Amino acid sequence: MRLRRLYVGLVVCSLTAVVHAQSTRPFPISDNDFYSTPSGAEVALGRALFFDKIISGNGNISCATCHHPLAGTGDGLSLSIGEGGKGLGLARDTGSGVDAVQGRIPRHTPHVFNLAAKEFSVMFHDGRLSVDDLEASGFNSPAGDQLPLGLDSVLAAQAMFPVTSSTEMAGQAGENPVANAAFEGRLAGENGVWDLLAQRLRAIPEYVVMFRDAYPEQISTADDIQFKDAANAIASFEGAAGRADNSRFDQFLRGDSQA
């Protein structure tokens, strides 16, 4: 009798543990956890821009230079080497003498995995960019009122800023018009940082076609292209390429007990 009671007790405890485990299991990640599911045309445009050095002041660095796929979307360096550096990843060099970079970026390059998820509402190491419904743009940022309307997510808003930094992508004052505008704090408006970069993109027929395909309701001619459209596309590519939700654990959460 005692053994029977012990057996029944163990069964009850086991069932209770299973029920508890199932009730506390996290929900699987789904499309609803992300800001959007971009079109293939938007992702293709974002991919092209992500790897293109044309959106840097001196045309010598792209987003992918520091957020390299082969380095886990980072660069493997404790302090990143931005504009003016040579090489990729751990082989990236600051140069020397007159060819040396003006300064290293005082932080490492963050990854882009799952940053398109809605749970991320703050960007940058110091939180200087965040979602804020009280701001006209929808974001509290160092650009203040210069940040344009129409940015799809905080990740897209983040993509507006590396191009304004002298050590990241803009270059030093005196080297190019983009760097000069950044040095003077002219981010928005005619011949501001973002407009100067948009002018470059408008002058490339292949990009005009890609922008039209990605945003047919907003863009019909080259003159319609704004840098915020480029930022939205870059964020869409980062969101699609950096989405990591198909591990064996993710599969288990979706109901695959054999994962």
Locate each region found by the language model.
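Periplasmic c-type cytochrome electron-transfer domains
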Residues: 2-7, 20-259
